[in-house]
Amino acid sequence: MPKMKTKSSAKKRFKITASGKVKVAAAGKRHGMIKRSNKFIRDARGTMVLSDQDAKKVIQYYLPNGF
């Protein structure tokens, strides 16, 4: 059976840290920010780390080669 390919869309959205955690940008920031609270805008800045369960699934299905 051939080796699984990495999903190209996942390469652009997820980064795996040296310790094996998965970093991702916070969602909900494309438009409509005028009605959001300052706390939401501040908390959505930068990146966040996925939970262990979600990270396991992302690596297993979308990033099998560890991109």
Swiss-Prot record:
Q: Keywords of this protein's UniProt record, alphabetized?
A: Ribonucleoprotein, Ribosomal protein
Regions annotated as coiled coil: none
User: GO BP, one example?
Assistant: translation
Q: What is this protein called?
A: Large ribosomal subunit protein bL35
User: Does the keyword Transport feature in the UniProt annotation?
Assistant: no
Q: What is the lineage of its organism?
A: Bacteria, Pseudomonadati, Pseudomonadota, Alphaproteobacteria, Hyphomicrobiales
PANTHER family in UniProt: 54S RIBOSOMAL PROTEIN BL35M, LARGE RIBOSOMAL SUBUNIT PROTEIN BL35M
Q: Which GO terms describe its cellular component?
A: cytosolic large ribosomal subunit
**Which InterPro entries has this protein been placed in?**
Ribosomal_bL35, Ribosomal_bL35-like, Ribosomal_bL35_CS, Ribosomal_bL35_sf
**UniProt record similarity statement:** Belongs to the bacterial ribosomal protein bL35 family.
The UniProt gene name for this protein comes to: rpmI
